[in-house]
Structures are given as structure tokens and as C-alpha cells.
């Protein structure tokens, strides 16, 4: 009789890599042109003045200035860059 148990295969043990989403530059901080402000899935935050939106809904600064978060009608959150 064999003294070893049969080695069962496991179906678990794998996970996807984290995508590092979220706010990268917070309110009242200075952003350079082209710097990423938010990485997101969908448009949780919408681009305001001087902010561009990438094809994966990443928001980035178009000019150098201070990041400003604001909520407008319908609970929409907008991010703008205020230039000095």
C-alpha cells in the first residue's frame, strides 16, 4: 500500500495585478502640464477647465496651475486647473 497521499491540484491562488487607480494630485496642489491628476474607471470625476481626459478616462493637466475640485449640478464632480 502506498504511503503518500494523492497530490490534488488547486484551482485557486491567482489574482490580477492592482491597477493603482485613484487621485494622484490632490486639491490645492500644483500640477505641471501633462501630469496625471486622477486614474479612474469610468467618469467618476469629469474634466473641467484646463483638464484633459484620456481614452481610459484618466484626467490630466493641460496647463501648469493649482488643482481645484468642485461639485456641480446633479452631483457631478469636476476637476479644474486654476492658473496663477
Swiss-Prot record:
GO cellular component assignments: cytosolic large ribosomal subunit
Claim: Ribonucleoprotein is one of the keywords in the record = yes
Q: Which Pfam families match?
A: Ribosomal_L27 (PF01016)
Q: Which UniProt keywords apply?
A: Ribonucleoprotein, Ribosomal protein
Q: Name one GO molecular function term.
A: structural constituent of ribosome
Task: Name the segments for region: Disordered.
Answer: 1-21
Quote the Gene3D superfamilies the UniProt record gives: 2.40.50.100
InterPro entries xrefs: Ribosomal_bL27, Ribosomal_bL27_CS
Top-level taxon: Bacteria
List the GO biological process terms: translation
Keyword set includes Transmembrane helix: no
Stated family: Belongs to the bacterial ribosomal protein bL27 family.
NCBIfam families from the UniProt entry: L27
Q: Which HAMAP family match?
A: Ribosomal_bL27 (MF_00539)
Q: What is this protein called?
A: Large ribosomal subunit protein bL27
Organism (species): Baumannia cicadellinicola subsp. Homalodisca coagulata
Amino acid at each position: 500500500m502506498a504511503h503518500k497521499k494523492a497530490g490534488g491540484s488547486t484551482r485557486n491562488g491567482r489574482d490580477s495585478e492592482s491597477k493603482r487607480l485613484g487621485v494622484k494630485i490632490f486639491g490645492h496642489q500644483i500640477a505641471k502640464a501633462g501630469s496625471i491628476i486622477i486614474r479612474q474607471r469610468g467618469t467618476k470625476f469629469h474634466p473641467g477647465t484646463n483638464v484633459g481626459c484620456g481614452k481610459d478616462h484618466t484626467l490630466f493637466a493641460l496647463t501648469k496651475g493649482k488643482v481645484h475640485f468642485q461639485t456641480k449640478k446633479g452631483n457631478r464632480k469636476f476637476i479644474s486647473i486654476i492658473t496663477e
